Amino acid sequence: MYHISAEDIYLFHQGTNFESHQFLGCHEINWKGKRGYRFAVWAPNALKVCVVGDFNNWEENSHPLEKFTDEGLWGGFIADIPPATSYKYHICSSEDTSILKADPFATQAERRPKTASVIPAANGYQWSDDQWIEQRNTYDPYSSPISIYEVHLGTWKKTLKKQFLSYRELATQLIPYVKSLGYTHIELLPINEHPFDRSWGYQITGYFAVTSRYGNPSDFKYFIDQCHQHQIGVILDWVPGHFCKDDFGLRQFDGAPLYEYRDPKKSEKKSWGTLAFDYGRPEVQSFLISNAIYWLKEFHIDGLRVDAVASMLYLNFDRYDEEEKIYNTYGGEENLEAFAFLRKLNKVVFSYIPGALMMAEDSSDLPLVTAPVNKGGLGFNYKWNMGWMNDLLSFMEKESIHRKWHHNRLTFSFMYTYSENYLLPLSHDEVVHGKKSLLDKMPGDQWQQFANLRLLYGYMYTHPGKKLVFMGGELAQYAEWKDTEELDWHLLEYPLHKGIYHYIKNLNELYQQHPELYELDHLSEGFEWIDPHNIDQSVIAFRRKANKPNQELIIICNFTPQVHFDYKIGVPESGRYKEIFNSDSVRFGGSGQINEGEHFSFPEKWHGLSQHIKIKVPPLAISVFQIEVERERLPRE
């Protein structure tokens, strides 16, 4: 019926139609010699479904749909409707109530505060990123540098009239800016349609609709296309964990729970005032997995960061009172349907897009999140390392004189860093809701705060794991993220803030030019401690290695403002060592305690290694050394 195949219908109800957006929703077709639009919607509890909109003056009964499957699919054809027309579904429920709903599969929506779906224009966008897509197919993310600039498009920068920049304006401003800083990827906070600006996109009503705040779908494709032509990947925050309760959205779509669990205990997400998807329902699986495939295929998105995974996996994620708690059939707290859904999602995504990035924002200690599904894992590429982030920020917030009492928070991450493929996040969540900006978290006077911030970033970039920094991190903002205003761009007029900007740029350059810092991120062979035990002085030293034999860097971090002279560091090879990076450089706003010239190794064991060098350890800083060449003769001490 209406060019909808029996196979598509069958697979949708089996939970295995992974491109169900191709037949559900609104699509332009030829039907019986007429040009128009086919509408199809899943509403099994409805007694009647009509399409209403601008084209029929929102008359409730003028364009009824036909129920063409026993499982509740409704469809119809309407001729001579122009593109960009607004519409909704008028649904009469089994409770004999009438409701107006936006189309769950709509690819465009009205700009808030309006809430209707919009009939899309013909898809005429011509992509120019063939070379990027081709190289993505053979891309190995594990041995490649990944440095992500996390962005909320509405508050990165605004027009002179304090309005949002459009997708096309962002393409001309944001992309060159990110490229100049040296990032490899942009990660966008959710751009699915959402009614409330200050939800940041995490409470969605239109899963297939790119938000109209910044333009239309073609404009967003242009933005992504330009990213790819500048060799920048694009990752979307994707929210399959919950959806908002607005009346026009998915909640009780046909008058009864449909996309959400029927049991309110299971569906309620109390922390956010939202509803959980019913992961055990086949049609919901088809809806969500189709949505993931839609963004990856239709918009050439390079990866998805799956939001709030722990809230999906655990039935009692935000339930603390015993009488509120629920359990699975085996008496456990795991949502077994969510486990199965995520495994299915990742298997399907990688079958469609082998080079995709699938990243789990998971705050739990569940093992095997990034292990393959056939080995009992969830099948993600990467997991956000929330433990590293929490421990490190807690450590850095301590006055330097007290850090020795919390040394384990600095080093504990290495007890588990190779148990998963990790990404190290300094995300938007850490600079909002009274948590303070990264700079404001740092203790000490102004100089120490900036030095601590440089040290924080430096330790992050030399620690195993891919990198993510939220926008504004390069400006060293004093204020936390203001989710209604643009970044504090005026700070770049001040030398210390400008120094952080240049520092981030140089860190990205160091990171990408040295495979020691990324090539073996996922293997323990890529890291070796030199000295993790200097608790009293809060100095640590370690080695980062690449695949090539003897290609390695020596990293020293000093977490106090004390300068150490003639400090011995064990090194593995005899030769000349040169400092190639120092966060205390004057050009970054530091005090200039750098190591100039070459440092010859001495044939005396130190830190369990056959050689050592003597260096100056700068205050609240990170130093990176590289062996230059082996030498024939060692000087006397």
Curated annotation (Swiss-Prot):
Gene3D superfamilies: Glycosidases (3.20.20.80), Golgi alpha-mannosidase II (2.60.40.1180), Immunoglobulins (2.60.40.10). It catalyses: Transfers a segment of a (1->4)-alpha-D-glucan chain to a primary hydroxy group in a similar glucan chain. One of its GO terms (molecular function) is hydrolase activity, hydrolyzing O-glycosyl compounds. SUPFAM superfamilies: (Trans)glycosidases, E set domains, Glycosyl hydrolase domain. The keyword Glycosyltransferase applies. The active site is at D307, E361. Keywords: Carbohydrate metabolism, Glycogen biosynthesis, Glycogen metabolism, Glycosyltransferase, Transferase. Pathway: Glycan biosynthesis; glycogen biosynthesis. One of its GO terms (biological process) is glycogen biosynthetic process. Belongs to the glycosyl hydrolase 13 family. GlgB subfamily. This is 1,4-alpha-glucan branching enzyme GlgB. It comes from Oceanobacillus iheyensis (strain DSM 14371 / CIP 107618 / JCM 11309 / KCTC 3954 / HTE831). The gene is glgB.
